[in-house]
């Protein structure tokens, strides 16, 4: 019995070309053919599937709201959690160094692998099969799309707050530390003419920027920190 059969059962798709699934599970640190190209494709396919569902289920929603709702469905945290739920982390092929540093628990690696699998299913069986698999993974989240309330991210709220007062837009200074496979992003957020300066630290630049923006809003003490999401945009 192929050791990937259990994973394919969880994914809801039996691959015709098993090599596609193997590549989708292979991180670049392993030194073999890796999943970066499949991830690139899967990112677009996944975004299209969710965007299409939102378009059908939320006919009254505006473009900006649709974009924010899609982002909440396909952000790194969401994809990493789904990757673990499907057991993808158990099958990842990593280099020795990446394994020792906890790569199978790393959010970005988990999210990238899920996107790569989406790309692999798309190549292996086409869009409709891929759509069926993706919507099945999301389960009740798909049914909730018609009720999903769009939240603006911290960067958008900060920009709107500043524009409403005719103030300069925020500046985000980024410092990157660590090895290429385990980078840490430190972002400082400030606005010319205002005394505040805040910092956000995370393993992705986008999330670090969101954290810094949220903290900046909280310093403004204008009620804008309530209900803000720091998710990637």
Curated annotation (Swiss-Prot):
Residues 4-126 form the RNase III domain. It is found in: Cytoplasm. Its cofactor is Mg(2+). The keyword NADP does not apply. GO terms for molecular function: double-stranded RNA binding; metal ion binding; ribonuclease III activity; rRNA binding. One of its GO terms (biological process) is mRNA processing. SMART domains: DSRM (SM00358), RIBOc (SM00535). The active site is at 43, 115. Keywords: Cytoplasm, Endonuclease, Hydrolase, Magnesium, Metal-binding, mRNA processing, Nuclease, RNA-binding, rRNA processing, rRNA-binding, tRNA processing. Residues 153-222 form the DRBM domain. Its EC number is 3.1.26.3. It comes from the Bacteria. GO terms for cellular component: cytoplasm. Its main location: cytoplasm. It catalyses: Endonucleolytic cleavage to 5'-phosphomonoester. Gene3D superfamilies: 3.30.160.20, Ribonuclease III domain (1.10.1520.10). Homodimer. Digests double-stranded RNA. Involved in the processing of primary rRNA transcript to yield the immediate precursors to the large and small rRNAs (23S and 16S). Processes some mRNAs, and tRNAs when they are encoded in the rRNA operon. Processes pre-crRNA and tracrRNA of type II CRISPR loci if present in the organism. Belongs to the ribonuclease III family. This is Ribonuclease 3. It comes from Coxiella burnetii (strain CbuK_Q154) (Coxiella burnetii (strain Q154)).
């Amino acid at each position: 019995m192929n050791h990937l059969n259990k994973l394919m059962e969880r994914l809801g798709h039996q691959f015709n070309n098993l090599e596609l699934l193997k590549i989708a599970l292979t991180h670049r640190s392993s030194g073999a053919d890796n999943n970066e190209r499949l991830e690139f494709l899967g990112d677009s396919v996944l975004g299209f599937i969710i965007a299409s569902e939102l378009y059908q289920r939320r006919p009254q929603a505006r473009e900006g709201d649709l974009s924010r709702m899609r982002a909440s469905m396909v952000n790194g945290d969401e994809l990493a959690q789904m990757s673990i739920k499907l057991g993808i982390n158990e099958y990842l092929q990593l280099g020795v160094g990446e394994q020792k540093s906890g790569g199978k628990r790393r959010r970005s690696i988990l999210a990238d692998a899920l996107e790569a699998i989406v790309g692999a299913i798309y190549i292996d069986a086409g869009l409709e099969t891929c759509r069926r698999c993706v919507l099945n993974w999301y389960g009740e989240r798909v049914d909730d799309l018609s009720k999903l309330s769009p939240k603006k991210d911290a960067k958008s709220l900060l920009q709107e707050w500043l524009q409403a007062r005719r103030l300069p837009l925020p500046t985000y200074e980024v410092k990157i530390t660590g090895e290429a496979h385990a980078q840490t992003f430190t972002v400082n957020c400030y606005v010319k003419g205002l005394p505040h300066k805040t910092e956000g630290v995370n393993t992705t630049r986008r999330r670090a920027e969101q954290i810094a923006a949220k903290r900046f809003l909280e310093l403004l003490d204008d009620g804008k920190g309530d209900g803000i999401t720091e998710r990637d945009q």
